[in-house]
């Protein structure tokens, strides 16, 4: 029997842990699969995905900066992908790509089950309004948060995200320069890529955003998360959490969509933490 082909698309993508995660899931469940990382710039993504499908690709994950492009080329969409306006999981069915988004489910599962957080009643600051932010915002609302304030370098994108979520009573956008006037939050989520240059000054956020319960969460992991988590610790946030757990949980959701079985995530998460010093330092 030929081995099924899967991949993660991004730009850049060489750093991705997804191939290792899905290889571990395959061993755990006894499912033979070939999962690789494919670097595709936005203008090359459609052609790269077509080649992948022609070569027998059955499913794909999509990371920055391609999630909104994946949304646009999906022949059909899950409800959560439609609300998010972004796709991180593609399933090949009847010669077409079906788009889904497992990011939000992965984040909520990591925060509530791995870290034991109760999201109900929390006031949330969401930094960013791109594909990553769009992926997690609907799931946070479903988890019972009280209010979400979206702040983005481009106010128009923040407004567009708020409009797409369709809950004006709970979701508002604010300007970056207004951060000092926003009050404090129980959850601060960094959904930007500002930490990629590892500049600690990129997250010189006001200390007034933090209260005694604040959990600061970076959707990135590894070196990219270090600057934001350093700020979180200096601000004495109760929790400083990187995106590794979310990555593993969203991968498990994708795996279940493709194979019909949800793998155990704790062994994979623990193994990744144990083997990589950068990941440990970003925890």
Swiss-Prot record:
One BP annotation, GO: chorismate biosynthetic process
Keyword Oxidoreductase in record: yes
Catalytic activity line of the entry: shikimate + NADP(+) = 3-dehydroshikimate + NADPH + H(+)
UniProt pathway annotation: Metabolic intermediate biosynthesis; chorismate biosynthesis; chorismate from D-erythrose 4-phosphate and phosphoenolpyruvate: step 4/7
Cellular component annotations (GO), alphabetically ordered: cytosol
Similarity section: Belongs to the shikimate dehydrogenase family.
Subunit structure: Homodimer.
Protein name: Shikimate dehydrogenase (NADP(+))
């Amino acid at each position: 029997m030929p081995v099924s082909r899967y991949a993660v698309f991004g730009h850049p993508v060489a750093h991705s842990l997804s191939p290792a995660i899905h290889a571990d899931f395959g061993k755990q469940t006894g499912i033979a699969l070939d999962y690789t990382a494919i670097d595709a710039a936005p203008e090359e993504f459609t052609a790269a995905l077509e080649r992948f499908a022609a070569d027998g690709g059955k499913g794909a994950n999509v990371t920055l900066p391609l999630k909104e492009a994946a949304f646009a080329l999906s022949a059909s969409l899950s409800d959560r992908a439609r609300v998010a306006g972004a796709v991180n999981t593609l399933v090949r069915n009847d010669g077409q790509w079906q788009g889904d988004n497992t990011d939000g489910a992965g984040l909520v599962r990591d925060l509530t089950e791995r870290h034991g957080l109760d999201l109900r009643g929390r006031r949330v600051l969401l930094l960013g309004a791109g594909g990553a932010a769009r992926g997690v915002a609907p799931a946070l609302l479903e988890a019972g948060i009280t209010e979400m304030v979206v702040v983005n370098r481009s106010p128009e994108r923040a407004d567009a995200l708020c409009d797409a979520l369709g809950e004006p009573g709970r979701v508002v956008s604010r300007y970056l320069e207004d951060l000092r006037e926003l009050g404090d939050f129980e959850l601060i989520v960094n959904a930007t890529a500002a930490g990629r240059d590892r500049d600690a000054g990129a997250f010189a956020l006001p200390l007034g955003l933090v209260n005694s319960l604040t959990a600061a969460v970076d959707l990135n992991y590894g070196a990219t998360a270090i600057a934001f988590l350093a700020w979180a610790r200096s601000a004495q946030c109760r929790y400083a959490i990187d995106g590794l757990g979310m990555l593993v949980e969203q991968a498990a959701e994708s795996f279940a969509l493709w194979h019909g079985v949800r793998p155990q995530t704790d062994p994979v998460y623990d193994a990744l933490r144990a083997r990589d010093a950068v990941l440990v330092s970003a925890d």
